[in-house]
């Protein structure tokens, strides 16, 4: 049994806290910390105040160090903002504690995310005898594990992957994002990159559109190609992959609003002066959009996130589709959050279980696909995210 410190009390933090509390056999003590302690206290109240709460500025290494020394966890689960990954990693190094996150580092002033900043910590974590597990959400995270499963069990050589993320839910709002609006809009407006024949190919944001027929009654939906961080680590650690693409569904309504917001400058991340004050338009937009946490009781429908992997098996072309279906209303009933937060938070807890039980262990900085996928998936299903495998069959080449 081990103590865990969770940093971040948004929608994902709420899920992580609830799911850790369901596994007291692993997480004997839980502390939830955020810049706004009232958010932590509200989540604690949902759990009959059976957890500790604390205030911390995750941009401030000395504050983080003081909190970690006080709470003495064996693991820090970082579900704060991607801008804060490095300060939390620094604090873990200073205090000798293992680290886990769900999204890679991104500088505040540049809409660019990549693993180079965090991979640079490899020698420091290894030298300290510590483990850092990066991207233990769903995508990245479970999608990496699905790719590793395809390589281990279904294909002798994985040559192509399509990671496909569908939110077939509806919240009834004119325009809202299902997670932090600032992070979401920065992500979807960034130039698209995909991996092909040993190099990154850049195209316009959401410029490539296809249709995909999703299972479990969801049916055909439009999907758009975009860049997503797990491709960077997957093609590094599974070098047989010649082509890797990431696709996501967006409604026409979402795209229409996004285009207008871009055209009028509201997605800018640089400062502008207004009434003698400097503001960042995208941060102002975040303040006026619905809080993603408020969408839980409004959201109905399902998500479907998975990987279509193609390659060779016994010298013949073969493909496998590995995916999960998650229901928004069922998630809200269980933990008070919609499926977007649930599908990120549950894998973070499972990653923590892998680390604390020694099923996944190493010294240094690791991505999910570097470990055996099966122990992770054996825990993920009972924790609420079962895996479906369709081995063979016809799936369109995207």
Annotate each predicted stretch with a short phrase:
Residues 152-398:
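C-terminal catalytic/substrate-binding lobe primarily of soluble NAD(P)-dependent oxidoreductases
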Residues 103-130:
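Rossmann-fold NAD(P)-binding glycine/threonine-rich loop
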Residues 47-60:
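Rossmann-fold cofactor-recognition segment
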Residues 12:
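Hydrophobic/small residue at the entry helix of a nucleotide-binding pocket
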Residues 36-38:
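Helix N-cap at the beta1-alpha1 junction of Rossmann-like dinucleotide-binding domains, i.e.
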Residues 29-31:
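Short beta-strand element of Class I
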Residues 58-71, 80, 84:
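Conserved Rossmann-fold cofactor-binding substructure of NAD(P)-dependent oxidoreductases
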């Amino acid at each position: 049994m081990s103590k865990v410190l969770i940093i971040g009390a948004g929608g994902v933090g709420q899920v992580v806290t609830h799911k850790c509390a369901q596994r007291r056999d692993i997480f004997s003590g839980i502390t939830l910390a955020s810049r706004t302690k009232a958010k932590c206290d509200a989540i604690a109240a949902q759990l009959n105040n059976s957890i500790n709460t604390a205030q911390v500025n995750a941009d401030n290494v000395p504050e983080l160090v003081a909190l970690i020394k006080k709470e003495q966890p064996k693991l820090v689960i970082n579900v704060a903002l991607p801008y804060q990954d490095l300060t939390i990693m620094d604090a873990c190094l200073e205090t000798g504690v293992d680290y886990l996150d769900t999204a890679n580092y991104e500088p505040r002033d540049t809409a660019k995310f990549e693993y180079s900043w965090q991979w640079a910590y490899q020698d420091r974590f290894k030298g300290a005898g510590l483990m850092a597990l990066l991207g233990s959400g769903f995508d990245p995270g479970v999608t990496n594990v699905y790719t590793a499963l395809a390589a281990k069990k279904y294909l002798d050589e994985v040559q192509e992957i399509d990671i496909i993320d569908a939110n077939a839910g509806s919240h009834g709002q004119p325009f809202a994002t299902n997670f932090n609006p600032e992070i979401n809009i920065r992500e979807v407006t960034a130039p698209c990159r995909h991996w092909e024949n040993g190099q990154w190919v850049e195209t316009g944001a959401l410029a490539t559109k296809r249709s995909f027929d999703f299972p479990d009654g969801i049916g055909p939906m439009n999907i758009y190609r975009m860049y997503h961080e797990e491709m960077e680590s997957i093609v590094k650690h599974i070098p047989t992959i010649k082509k890797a693409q990431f696709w996501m569904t967006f409604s026409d309504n979402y795209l229409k609003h996004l285009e207008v917001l871009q055209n009028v400058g509201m997605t800018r991340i640089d400062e502008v002066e207004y009434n003698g004050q400097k503001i960042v338009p995208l941060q102002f937009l975040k303040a006026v959009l619905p809080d993603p946490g408020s969408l839980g009781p409004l959201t109905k429908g399902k998500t479907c996130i998975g990987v279509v992997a193609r390659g060779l098996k016994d010298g013949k072309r073969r493909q496998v589709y590995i995916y999960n279906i998650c229901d928004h209303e069922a998630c809200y009933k269980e933990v008070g959050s919609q499926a977007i937060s649930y599908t990120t938070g549950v894998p973070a807890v499972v990653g923590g279980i892998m680390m604390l039980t020694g099923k996944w262990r190493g010294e240094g900085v690791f991505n999910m696909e570097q470990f055996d996928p099966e122990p992770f998936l054996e825990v993920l299903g009972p924790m609420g995210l079962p895996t479906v495998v369709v081995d063979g069959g016809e799936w369109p080449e995207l």
